[in-house]
């Protein structure tokens, strides 16, 4: 077996590397070339507009494409650029804006992986005769430990917990996992940068990408307002107890858990606890009203060994992440008449619809990824949940 788990020599194994123009994917290409693989680099042009072209911390824009080209020249592999701008707008940017208007907190990186990168680019890699598509994600995959799943691969958290990207890859299907390879899963980021220096890559000191790639300076409301100029509709700011505290200029300017910049002064610390898109109300309350114990899921991608229905029906003990920056915490996957849900044993504050809930076998670097789903709705502590339901049943002021 070679290092990518193929039963052939590296020189007889063709690998397409998804190159964003950053240090991680560049090192992947360099490592595979060094090992003797037949490597092709492909960069997707996803957008190339105005300030985004030269904005530090972006990805897949003009400067990044040029950096990827220079890296490929340095290591001696072919480089191709594919224009996926229309596809990216259709499947990632527009749904992002629509989700925000609906009062959700979307994760466009998951949509990008599942539509553009792991669907379209993966299909292109196969058309080019590649045996695998390699990326610079910090996650591990290896052959399934179960004999009954021989030939399949499983996902695991990476060695560098600070760089763990498994949360954004929970929706990766089994077919995609079997074709993908993640050479950086066993490396710390510091070693990746050291390798880039050693290889003489122009991106060795390049800053990591930050925030959402198509959102300048992380101002989500700006991109939503630009795409949906009529979406910023005014409404009320309402306390959980029913008091109308003020007015707002559009729920797209708020997120669940927000405290600063709410626009009301009451002498008590208030947080955004719910965004009522139907009645255009921003509902606020005390911090304890953010505490979430249960999240209902949609679009679940299950990677466990048991059948999903059987596992949830019995109560499947696992660990869950509802934010990319948190460690997996104890949870139980269950189901009822409404559908699949996850009980968060220790609770979590400020969980919003649209976020992901990724499931794991444990908390360590070798924990297996069981998949997950998008949060459809969450349930708070009983008192806050009852107050919210009563408020949502009451009509908003005209």
UniProtKB/Swiss-Prot annotation:
<dbReference type="InterPro" id="IPR046885">
    <property type="entry name" value="MnmA-like_C"/>
</dbReference>
<dbReference type="InterPro" id="IPR014729">
    <property type="entry name" value="Rossmann-like_a/b/a_fold"/>
</dbReference>
<keyword id="KW-0820">tRNA-binding</keyword>
<feature type="binding site">
    <location>
        <begin position="18"/>
        <end position="25"/>
    </location>
    <ligand>
        <name>ATP</name>
    </ligand>
</feature>
<keyword id="KW-0963">Cytoplasm</keyword>
<keyword id="KW-0819">tRNA processing</keyword>
<keyword id="KW-0808">Transferase</keyword>
<dbReference type="InterPro" id="IPR004506">
    <property type="entry name" value="MnmA-like"/>
</dbReference>
<feature type="binding site">
    <location>
        <position position="136"/>
    </location>
    <ligand>
        <name>ATP</name>
    </ligand>
</feature>
<dbReference type="GO" id="GO:0005524">
    <property type="term" value="F:ATP binding"/>
</dbReference>
<keyword id="KW-0547">Nucleotide-binding</keyword>
<dbReference type="Pfam" id="PF20258">
    <property type="entry name" value="tRNA_Me_trans_C"/>
</dbReference>
<dbReference type="Pfam" id="PF20259">
    <property type="entry name" value="tRNA_Me_trans_M"/>
</dbReference>
<comment type="similarity">
    <text>Belongs to the MnmA/TRMU family.</text>
</comment>
<protein>
    <recommendedName>
        <fullName>tRNA-specific 2-thiouridylase MnmA</fullName>
        <ecNumber>2.8.1.13</ecNumber>
    </recommendedName>
</protein>
<keyword id="KW-0694">RNA-binding</keyword>
<dbReference type="InterPro" id="IPR046884">
    <property type="entry name" value="MnmA-like_central"/>
</dbReference>
<dbReference type="GO" id="GO:0000049">
    <property type="term" value="F:tRNA binding"/>
</dbReference>
<feature type="disulfide bond" description="Alternate">
    <location>
        <begin position="112"/>
        <end position="213"/>
    </location>
</feature>
<feature type="site" description="Interaction with tRNA">
    <location>
        <position position="355"/>
    </location>
</feature>
<feature type="binding site">
    <location>
        <position position="44"/>
    </location>
    <ligand>
        <name>ATP</name>
    </ligand>
</feature>
<dbReference type="GO" id="GO:0002143">
    <property type="term" value="P:tRNA wobble position uridine thiolation"/>
</dbReference>
<keyword id="KW-0067">ATP-binding</keyword>
<feature type="active site" description="Cysteine persulfide intermediate">
    <location>
        <position position="213"/>
    </location>
</feature>
<dbReference type="InterPro" id="IPR023382">
    <property type="entry name" value="MnmA-like_central_sf"/>
</dbReference>
<feature type="active site" description="Nucleophile">
    <location>
        <position position="112"/>
    </location>
</feature>
<dbReference type="Pfam" id="PF03054">
    <property type="entry name" value="tRNA_Me_trans"/>
</dbReference>
<dbReference type="GO" id="GO:0103016">
    <property type="term" value="F:tRNA-uridine 2-sulfurtransferase activity"/>
</dbReference>
<feature type="region of interest" description="Interaction with tRNA">
    <location>
        <begin position="163"/>
        <end position="165"/>
    </location>
</feature>
<comment type="function">
    <text>Catalyzes the 2-thiolation of uridine at the wobble position (U34) of tRNA, leading to the formation of s(2)U34.</text>
</comment>
<dbReference type="GO" id="GO:0005737">
    <property type="term" value="C:cytoplasm"/>
</dbReference>
<keyword id="KW-1015">Disulfide bond</keyword>
<feature type="site" description="Interaction with tRNA">
    <location>
        <position position="137"/>
    </location>
</feature>
């Amino acid at each position: 077996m070679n290092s990518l788990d193929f039963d052939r020599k590296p020189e007889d194994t063709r690998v397409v590397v998804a190159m964003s123009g950053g240090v991680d994917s560049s090192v992947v290409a360099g490592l595979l070339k060094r090992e003797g693989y037949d490597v092709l680099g492909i960069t997707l042009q996803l957008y190339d507009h105005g300030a985004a072209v030269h904005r530090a911390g972006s990805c897949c824009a003009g400067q990044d494409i040029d950096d990827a080209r220079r890296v490929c020249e340095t290591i001696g592999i072919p480089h191709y650029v594919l224009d996926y701008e229309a596809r990216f707008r259709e499947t990632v940017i527009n749904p992002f804006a629509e989700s925000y208007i609906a009062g959700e907190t979307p994760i466009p990186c998951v949509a990008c992986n599942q539509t553009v990168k792991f669907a379209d680019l993966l299909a292109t890699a196969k058309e080019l005769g590649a045996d695998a598509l390699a990326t610079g994600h910090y996650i591990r995959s290896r052959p399934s430990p179960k004999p009954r799943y021989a030939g399949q691969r499983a996902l695991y958290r990476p060695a560098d917990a600070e760089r763990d990207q498994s949360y954004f890859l929970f929706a990766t299907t089994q077919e995609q996992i079997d074709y993908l390879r993640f050479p950086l899963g066993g490396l710390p980021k510091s070693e990746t940068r050291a390798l880039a220096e050693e290889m003489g890559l122009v991106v060795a000191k390049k800053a990591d990408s930050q925030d959402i790639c198509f959102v300048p300076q992380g101002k989500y409301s700006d991109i939503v307002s630009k795409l949906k100029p009529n979406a910023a509709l005014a409404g009320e700011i309402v306390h959980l107890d029913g008091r109308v505290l003020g007015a707002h200029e559009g729920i797209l300017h708020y997120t669940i858990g927000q405290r600063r910049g709410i626009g009301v002064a009451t002498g008590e610390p208030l947080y955004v606890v719910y965004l009522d898109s139907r009645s255009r109300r921003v509902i606020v309350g005390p911090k304890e009203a953010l505490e979430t114990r249960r999240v209902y899921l949609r679009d679940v991608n299950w990677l466990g060994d048991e059948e999903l229905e059987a596992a949830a029906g019995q109560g499947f003990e696992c660990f869950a992440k509802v934010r990319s920056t948190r460690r997996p915490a104890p949870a139980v996957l269950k189901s009822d008449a409404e559908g699949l849900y996850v009980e968060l044993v220790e609770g979590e504050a400020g969980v919003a619809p649209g976020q992901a809930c990724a499931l794991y076998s444990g908390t360590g670097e070798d924990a297996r990824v069981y998949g997950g789903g998008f949060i459809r709705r969450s349930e708070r502590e009983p008192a806050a949940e009852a107050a919210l339901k009563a408020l949502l049943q009451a009509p908003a002021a005209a």
